From Swiss-Prot:
Its main location: nucleus. It holds the Pfam family EFhand_Ca_insen. This is Alpha-actinin-4. Residues 177-192 are annotated as: Polyphosphoinositide (PIP2)-binding. Ca(2+) binds at residues 778, 780, 789. It comes from Homo sapiens. Changing residue 259 to I: In FSGS1; no effect on protein abundance; no effect on homodimerization; loss of localization to the nucleus; prevents nuclear localization of the wild-type protein; decreased interaction with PPARG and RARA; loss of transcriptional coactivator activity; dominant negative effect on nuclear receptors-mediated transcription; increased actin-binding affinity.
Length: 911
């Protein structure tokens, strides 16, 4: 028997249809093409014929009842062609030619031919089916004709993901029944025998009608009858199959099953459209949620970084001076710890923040979303401004620390100098008041008086010589006050005491002179030799005291030149020692001569010079002290010279490394700039090259670490300048940070270009052409085009943006797309986005609104219940939380405005 049932492989009925397939969804191929000769005399399989009669009759009646009629016997009731024409009018919605009402055979044949002609006009080639067979009641041909009508008007338009007809209907069934246990739809015969697939289809769309979990696979008749009864009662799908026939047939008739299943498809077609709309909305919402997650990450990272900057700047701007150098050195150590430990992670966070921001903006542009505008105060520019403020505060803080350390060092030096001079002066003034108050002249002889007068003159000479020391003490105290020395109170007290004592000495000296001069008239004797001794011994004694002060004086130098200057001065001082020694011997010779004269004249001396307290023993003692201090001074100067030579070595060592690292960083910066402009090869090649370049930069880090170690030694040695190099550690650090940031940003730009290329389908040749056009107008090779450069580029590409009103408006529109932040510059990434957008379709707000309208059943609003039914739970709640209440005249309680929500997704309104 000829198997015309194989025709279900395509939209035709005939023995050769199995080879045509369902791949031509829009094809009106030969529905009845022959594979072998059609044997009209062969009979249908009785079981299949029975199933087809029942199914096709029910299917026809489901449509004929709309016209108020039905058929009882499918091969008898269509013989006159009247109900056949009526059926075609109902299912097509079109008017057929007026039928002939005669009862003769010719009238019937003409009516059937009108029906067959109408079928053929729909692109269906009827093979081997003629009006005579239908009029004669040929069951095989009548069933074949009805199957052809079912294929054309009920199954042909079924399309699921580029498939159609049988394959589309089968794929639809597989998807709908996939979640159900014991259901595996692979065909339209035995996959449906247990009835579970029918129940699964109903439960998938109307779960309240079927208690699927209570169905048993081993009770197919119950399952089938349950599905048929529910479909007829609640879905208005007539019972087209008989449960016992399906169960008792080894292989149920495919056409009968497909006809019945197609009724389910059409009954649930609205739900199918809703599912498609829901999938589109889910896709759009998934993109939006991912972008919102990236925005939240950016906001948090930006907030944390800005908070750290906000907390750090006050610490760097705290310039409260400390009292001691130890406290300031601790502050300097804390600052170095901040530079080494706390700041580097924040530099990486800042770089990562810029990368995340650029990636987010690229994704937003690719998904046709508005550019991301961070919260107020959290723009990349705000972070850069805060970072710049931080680095300015950091630089000022370091300079302040070093200046404070220098100030405290000078204060310590001045304080020690003040104490030395004050101690020497106090030692000199000790007993002077008592001496000036002594009234020894009242009982002295004339010679004694003259001696007292000479002694007093010598004292006045000595007093005048000490005037410079007192002024130096006062000047040092004043400088300590001006430099805010922490122990200024004690210094001022001691200085005031010295000044008060000095004034008292001046007053007492004046009083004693008056007393001596008053008595002088009565006294004549004077020992000129002692007087000469006193006059020469006092200056010499002062010279030795000054020399001892200078030899014990502390010194602070920072360069070899300064220490060599001190050594030169010391050598010059040593060259004066022979003359000083001769002066000492001359003074001692005067003393010896006085003794010789006294002895020769039998003069009994008191043992001391009446005119001075400076004895030869004092002169010799101080001279010996000077002789001892000279080699000590030599040793101290040589030690300092060695220290400065070591410091010079550190300077040269640092300069040698810095003069290599600094130009290397500058060269790498220039090379990166050149690479970012030239960009030879594919984007993947460029990305690989840049990452290799980045690794070479990272591998260079040990050279920077070595320089940091050398810089640490310089700082520990308190070396504040270096004439051998123009590069400071701060310059090197800033250059290194800029180098890392630049290579990371360049890599990110290439990655974004790859992302844009893949998302938009841009070829490598197009990308290179875009780069060539961009570089041609990027005259300064800055990586961005100004408005005039960009306009010239657009004109070269054929855009009408001339300087007339219409061209200016078009140019302003394009600028708003490529420069949403109004920075006045168009980056290469923005240029690529614009060019790709001109040739690529993207989803729009109108598409999303249309999808929501499908879910809402063509209403202007949607309810939370409808959203929860059609969308996944998280995305349904996302929409409910953000949709505004619908305010239209047709609003119902709980109505939501999906139109404003959809436009807000694309930046056309506010959420």
């Amino acid at each position: 028997m000829v198997d015309y049932h194989a025709a279900n492989q395509s939209y035709q009925y005939g023995p050769s249809s199995a080879g045509n397939g369902a791949g031509g969804g829009g094809s009106m191929g030969d529905y009845m093409a022959q594979e072998d000769d059609w044997d009209r005399d062969l009979l249908l399989d009785p079981a299949w014929e029975k199933q087809q009669r029942k199914t096709f009759t029910a299917w026809c009646n489901s449509h004929l009842r709309k016209a108020g009629t039905q058929i009882e016997n499918i091969d008898e009731d269509f013989r006159d062609g009247l109900k056949l024409m009526l059926l075609l009018e109902v299912i097509s919605g079109e008017r057929l030619p007026k039928p002939e009402r005669g009862k003769m055979r010719v009238h019937k044949i003409n009516n059937v031919n009108k029906a067959l002609d109408f079928i053929a006009s729909k692109g269906v080639k009827l093979v081997s089916i003629g009006a005579e067979e239908i009029v004669d009641g040929n069951a095989k041909m009548t069933l074949g004709m009805i199957w052809t009508i079912i294929l054309r008007f009920a199954i042909q338009d079924i399309s699921v993901e580029e498939t159609s007809a049988k394959e589309g209907l089968l794929l639809w069934c597989q998807r709908k029944t996939a979640p159900y246990k014991n259901v595996n739809v692979q065909n339209f015969h035995i996959s449906w025998k247990d009835g579970l697939a029918f129940n699964a289809l109903i439960h998938r769309h109307r779960p309240e009608l079927i208690e699927y979990d209570k169905l048993r696979k081993d009770d197919p008749v119950t399952n089938l009858n349950n599905a048929f009864e529910v479909a007829e009662k609640y879905l208005d799908i007539p019972k087209m199959l008989d449960a016992e026939d399906i169960v008792n047939t080894a292989r149920p008739d495919e056409k009968a099953i497909m006809t019945y299943v197609s009724s389910f498809y059409h009954a649930f077609s609205g739900a199918q459209k809703a599912e498609t709309a829901a999938n589109r909305i889910c896709k759009v919402l998934a993109v939006n949620q991912e972008n919102e997650h990236l925005m939240e990450d950016y906001e948090k990272l930006a907030s944390d970084l800005l908070e750290w900057i906000r907390r750090t700047i006050p610490w760097l701007e705290d310039r409260v001076p400390q009292k001691t150098i130890q406290e300031m050195q601790q502050k300097l150590e804390d600052f170095r710890d901040y530079r080494r430990v706390h700041k580097p992670p924040k530099v990486q966070e800042k770089c990562q923040l810029e990368i995340n921001f650029n990636t987010l903006q690229t994704k937003l542009r690719l998904s046709n979303r508005p550019a991301f505008m961070p919260s107020e105060g959290k723009m990349v520019s705000d972070i850069n401004n805060g970072w710049q403020h931080l680095e300015q505060a950091e630089k000022g803080y370091e300079e302040w620390l070093l200046n404070e350390i220098r100030r405290l060092e000078r204060l310590d030096h001045l304080a020690e100098k003040f104490r030395q001079k004050a101690s020497i002066h106090e030692a000199w003034t000790d007993g002077k008041e008592a001496m000036l108050k002594h009234r020894d002249y009242e009982t002295a002889t004339l010679s004694d008086i003259k001696a007292l007068i000479r002694k007093h003159e010598a004292f006045e000479s000595d007093l005048a010589a000490h005037q410079d020391r007192v002024e130096q003490i006062a000047a040092i105290a004043q400088e300590l006050n001006e430099l805010d020395y922490y122990d200024s109170h004690n210094v001022n007290t001691r200085c005031q005491k010295i000044c008060d004592q000095w004034d008292a000495l001046g007053s007492l000296t004046h009083s004693r002179r008056e007393a001596l001069e008053k008595t002088e008239k009565q006294l004549e004797a004077i020992d000129q030799l002692h007087l000469e001794y006193a006059k020469r011994a006092a200056p010499f004694n002062n010279w030795m005291e000054s020399a001892m002060e200078d030899l014990q004086d502390m010194f602070i130098v920072h360069t070899i030149e300064e220490i060599e200057g001190l050594i030169s001065a010391h050598d010059q001082f040593k060259s004066t020692l022979p003359d000083a020694d001769r002066e000492r011997e001359a003074i001692l010779a005067i003393h010896k001569e006085a003794q010789r004269i006294a002895e020769s004249n039998h003069i009994k001396l008191s043992g001391s010079n009446p005119y001075t307290t400076v004895t030869p023993q004092i002169i010799n003692s101080k001279w010996e002290k000077v002789q001892q201090l000279v080699p000590k001074r030599d040793h101290a100067l040589l030690e300092e010279q060695s220290k400065q030579q070591s410091n010079e070595h550190l300077r040269r060592q640092f300069a040698s490394q810095a003069n290599v690292v600094g130009p290397w960083i500058q060269t790498k910066m220039e090379e990166i700039g050149r690479i970012s402009i030239e960009m030879n090869g594919t984007l993947e090649d460029q990305l690989s090259h840049l990452k290799q370049y980045e690794r070479s930069i990272v591998d260079y880090k040990p050279n920077l670490d070595l320089l940091e170690q050398q810089h640490q030694l310089i700082q520990e040695a308190l070396i504040f300048d270096n004439k051998h190099t123009n590069y400071t550690m701060e310059h090197i650090r800033v250059g290194w940070e800029q180098l890392l940031t630049t290579i990371a940003r360049t890599i990110n730009e290439v990655e974004n270009q790859i992302l844009t290329r893949d998302a938009k389908g841009i070829s490598q040749e197009q990308m290179q052409e875009f780069r060539a056009s961009f570089n041609h107008f990027d005259k300064d090779h800055g990586g961005a085009l100004g408005p005039e450069e960009f306009k010239a580029c657009l004109i070269s590409l054929g855009y009408d943006v001339e300087n007339d009103r219409q061209g200016e408006a078009e140019f302003n529109r394009i600028m708003s797309l490529v420069d949403p932040n109004h920075s006045g510059l168009v980056t290469f990434q923005a240029f690529i986005d614009f060019m790709s957008r001109e040739t690529t379709d993207t989803d729009t707000a109108d598409q999303v609104i249309a999808s929501f309208k499908v879910l809402a059943g063509d209403k202007n609003f949607i309810t939370a219940e409808e959203l929860r039914r059609e969308l996944p739970p998280d995305q349904a709640e996302y929409c409910i939380a953000r949709m505004a209440p619908y305010q239209g005249p047709d609003a119902v309680p709980g109505a939501l405005d999906y139109k404003s929500f959809s436009t807000a997704l694309y930046g056309e309104s506010d959420l």
